[in-house]
């Protein structure tokens, strides 16, 4: 028997089987129902298992409510607070190409340009939406410049939304409130940035940032713990190219200083910078006060003063 005939007969058998499962039970002709829990197709009349070990084509995860289902679903882009419309609106591509990558004609390009314009108008229909769009754009820009992770951007966006809902913006600039939200979110996430670093990437003055930050924290009741000098150490050590040993030694110095009350009333950035400089000397790694000053964005005088205070708390630091 040729291969062609064998394939033909196998195809006929397959078609017959599919026809039987579609038409009904092969024994009694009753209705066949699918038992998804057990992966079986069963006759509702006689109980014959027509098919078993069926393939579950549903998701591999489980959800117990609609909110959890939406969070786990991978259909469509996830919602995010970093966009003024939470990512729910439609975006029209600016590349002027069709689905196959071909360039659009002149008439089609003009049509798409008009559609984009109207789409953008509908996305920001009122002043509140325009305010939110501008602020979230500022938050994203500053977070990128500061190298902050996505969770900080999300938290900063939520804080700004709360400030907008509670009507805290009158009398204050959008940039000022947005900057204070980034500063607060970074501290809450344990990846703080100094006021000087924040001011370097912001469009408002340092004094306004500090003033607005205190106002937002007070009015919204945000829980922001005092900045820990140890949280600055990994970033400073990484930027200076120091080893893990030096980073660990710097944290030990700060813990000793904290136990002896050196932290009180001192800038956490200055203490962290001095500890990193001292740790580099202890581990025989080359660095200078000027390099540490540049990385930490703090004066060499402050580093020297904090260094000598750490020297009093830790007798092993070389002078």
Swiss-Prot record:
Signal peptide: none annotated. Residues 1-33, 59-89 are annotated as: Disordered. SUPFAM superfamilies: Cyclin-like, Zinc beta-ribbon. Gene3D superfamilies: 1.10.472.170, Cyclin-like (1.10.472.10). Sequence repeats lie at residues 137-220, 231-312. Belongs to the TFIIB family. Stabilizes TBP binding to an archaeal box-A promoter. Also responsible for recruiting RNA polymerase II to the pre-initiation complex (DNA-TBP-TFIIB). This is Transcription initiation factor IIB 6. It comes from Halobacterium salinarum (strain ATCC 700922 / JCM 11081 / NRC-1). The gene is tfbF.
